[in-house]
Amino acid sequence: MALKQWMLANIADNKGSLLTPDEQARVFCLSADWIRFLSLPDHDTVLLRDTVAAVEGARQLEMVYPAPEHVHRWSYLCPPEQVRVVIVGQDPYCDGSASGLAFGTLAGRPPPPSLNNVFRELARTVDGFQRPASGCLDAWARRGVLLLNTVFTVVHGQPGSHRHLGWQTLSNHVIRRLSERREHLVFMLWGADAHTCEYLIDRRRHLVLKSCHPSPRNTTRAFVGNDHFILANAYLDTHYRETMDWRLCG
């Protein structure tokens, strides 16, 4: 209730003051490369300004992760023209380890249970993969793996707490633009939230791989055994004559 009252009191009608691309990069903390690539329509810009304002309000009332400077690290580590694989998750870890990359943690933090299951699948299917001690996935991002959550912030200890703030305006637009403007990408959709994004992707131009979320709490289906990394590299080899190096330093 406190957050709702703050939003009503502080989020003004932004329709009369549209942002330039440079202003969008500053206000949304997105890289200039991604701002140019996304070409956000005016309506989405207005909605996203409201979302950013709501998150700023939430930070005044409770602990929100990741830190403001980390929310969109994905946009700085993985430029749009370098993307080869898109892994779509749900929202950040709510324990303070979130890094701005879906499933990844800050350097030096141990892998959470969900990421441990991802590493189990990698160890099963990728030659030479050694399970690292840290959950940092920055190396993947720099190689062209876009690690994208559908929701970019979360309240401490409350998974899914920011689903209602409108971050999907941005995450959906990222996926749609990549589908429209790039060719032969691999989209890995992990979990029910990620599956809702499938309609944004043109299957005639891209490979879409769906699986349950890697959380060990998922008791209905197994993530380990989905062969996503094998299938992704086979597709990349066909279209780019190269594969993704999934190994991470220990």
Swiss-Prot record:
Catalytic activity: Hydrolyzes single-stranded DNA or mismatched double-stranded DNA and polynucleotides, releasing free uracil
Keyword DNA-binding: no
GO cellular component: host cell nucleus
Gene3D superfamilies, per the entry: Uracil-DNA glycosylase-like domain
InterPro entries membership: UDG_fam1, Ura-DNA_Glyclase_AS, Uracil-DNA_glycosylase-like, Uracil-DNA_glycosylase-like_sf
GO biological process, one term: base-excision repair, AP site formation via deaminated base removal
Keywords: DNA damage, DNA repair, Host nucleus, Hydrolase
GO molecular function, one term: uracil DNA N-glycosylase activity
Record keyword Hydrolase present: yes
EC number: 3.2.2.27
Signal peptide as annotated in the record: none
Residues the record marks as active site: 91
Subcellular location: Host nucleus
Task of the protein: Excises uracil residues from the DNA which can arise as a result of misincorporation of dUMP residues by DNA polymerase or due to deamination of cytosine.
NCBIfam families, sorted: PRK05254.1-1, PRK05254.1-2, PRK05254.1-5, ung
Family statement drawn from the similarity comment of this UniProt entry: Belongs to the uracil-DNA glycosylase (UDG) superfamily. UNG family.
Protein name, entry field: Uracil-DNA glycosylase
Underlying gene: UL114
